[in-house]
Amino acid sequence: MTSSRLSLAADARDSILSHAREGAAGDPPAEVCGVLAGDSDARTVTAAHPVSNVAAEPRVAYELDPEETVSILEAIESAGDDAVGFYHSHPESDPVPSATDRERASWPGYVYLICSPDGRMTAHEWTGDEFRELSVAVE
């Protein structure tokens, strides 16, 4: 992946934000997460697939449920699409990579989209050493 831009389908954006708002409305608020599907070469996201957050501290961290993630990745591949990356929310902080996000990032070349319940979102490619910010275009 070489583009510095992520194209995000409006339906996928709406799904991600709805999921983030559900997590933020919890008591206590919790980060939500999921898998982004589409065309990895074009860096285009056409669908967002929610995955349960199984982190020990879901208010400040996320961990994709491994079994759900494998099932979703298989379904994406079966549909002829690619896993473009992952999304998660920051219900009580800005949508930028946290120290925890940096420590736990483990998929070089994939997109990590972070959103807040107020609709702000950022996207970053994990290089294996750092996050490289991407512009986000909703289409």
UniProtKB/Swiss-Prot annotation:
Q: How does activity depend on temperature?
A: Optimum temperature is 40-50 degrees Celsius. Is active over a wide range of temperature (20-60 degrees Celsius). However, the enzyme is not active at 70 degrees Celsius.
What is the main EC category here? hydrolase
> Which protein are we looking at?
Desampylase
Give the miscellaneous note.
Answer: Is optimally active at NaCl concentrations of 0.7-2 M, and displays little to no activity at low concentrations of salt (150 mM NaCl).
Task: State the free-text cofactor note.
Answer: Binds 1 zinc ion per subunit.
Q: What does the record say about pH dependence?
A: Optimum pH is 7-10. Displays little to no activity at low pH (pH 6.5 and below).
Q: Which PANTHER family match?
A: CYSO-CYSTEINE PEPTIDASE
**Cofactor(s) needed by this chain:** Zn(2+)
Q: Which family does it belong to?
A: Belongs to the peptidase M67B family.
Q: Which UniProt keywords apply?
A: Hydrolase, Metal-binding, Metalloprotease, Protease, Zinc
Record EC number: 3.4.19.15
Biological process GO terms, please? proteolysis
